Amino acid sequence: MNIWLSMLTTTGLGAIIGGFTNHLAIKMLFRPHRPIYIGKFQVPFTPGLIPKRRDELAVQLGKMVVEHLLTPEGIGKKLTNEEFQKGLIHWAQVEVDKVITNEQSLRHMLGKWDVAHVEKEATEKIEQVITEKIQAFLEEYYTYTWEQALPHSVHEKIENAIPNVSAFILKRAIHFFESEEGKSRLSKMIDDFFASRGALLNLVGMFLGNVSVVDRVQPEVIKFLGQDGTKQLLTDVLQKEWEKLKGRDVKELETFVEKEMIVSSILSAVKVEETVSKFLNQSVQQVCEPVRETIIEKVVPGVVTKGLKWGTENVESILHNLHLAEIVQQEVSTFSTERLEELVLSITKNELKMITYLGALLGGMIGIVQGLLLLFLK
């Protein structure tokens, strides 16, 4: 009985000592958190291993992340994974669709993003671009003649329109001279004519009577305007004037209308500020609806695919410029010892318990061996 009690005692003591020793060793990895002094003498093994080597641990963790976890090869493989790409494209489509179907106005969205000033800047920029384009256009065309400046199709249209213009002018002239206003104007012209010819012609005019002269001249004028020869004459005159105009420089236009006036007139007609304001008052959905399907089905997948391709090709450079090792090192260095202890224990809790139990098991086995040795020695 005493023999079995001795063996049980040595086994129990061995297990307790082995388990406690391992448990103490694990605790000494983290504790104490700070060095302990007796007078000027620092107690050995203080602080614990991890608090003492925290800076070195931070450096090594940074290297481990860069060299073994977030490697260019691993990230590149992930970026080229077909399932990952499909998932990312689907996520991007959902998020973009949320944005482009928003019923809030563009103005409200700009204010929300603190870029409300973009309306003024956009107006000024558009007006500046229009002004520059017009000025560049005029600078170029002012070096041409009208024949060079106008397209061949315009030349043809003008030349084909000249006979019609002649007919229109004569038709309007006939209509005018048939009216009372035209007759009155013709009468005044006759009066002025006789008045300028001296007393003799004035006497003849008085003898014939003004009304009778107008009544005689008016039908002749109308008859003259209605003749084909008159139409051909006017057509020839207009044709000659057109030929002269084609040979003149476009720059001569500047003597009648200055560049600034042309630019100002075009800007007034375009109404840039009003157009921009109306555009911004529309909802995001109204603006994007015509191209919504194109954006979701073509633009988003294309952008995501190209972005992933670019990321795959430049992943090494990106990781290098991110300085991940330094980021990890800085973050770990800012951890308190308590937080670092919690972090390590949350990862290795079960394994550390097993180490404690293993120490108890080994201690118990050593106790059994000691008990057997004592038995044989007796």
Curated annotation (Swiss-Prot):
Residues passing through the membrane, by range: 1-21, 357-377
Domain of life: Bacteria
Membrane topology type: Multi-pass membrane protein
Keyword Transmembrane: yes
Location, primary (coarse class): membrane
Keywords for the protein's UniProt record, in alphabetical order: Cell membrane, Membrane, Transmembrane, Transmembrane helix
Keyword DNA damage (UniProt): no
Localization: Cell membrane
A single GO cellular-component term on record: plasma membrane
Cross-referenced InterPro entries: DUF445 (IPR007383), UCP032178 (IPR016991)
PANTHER family found in the cross-reference section: UPF0754 MEMBRANE PROTEIN YHEB (PTHR35791:SF1)
Protein name, entry field: UPF0754 membrane protein BT9727_0767
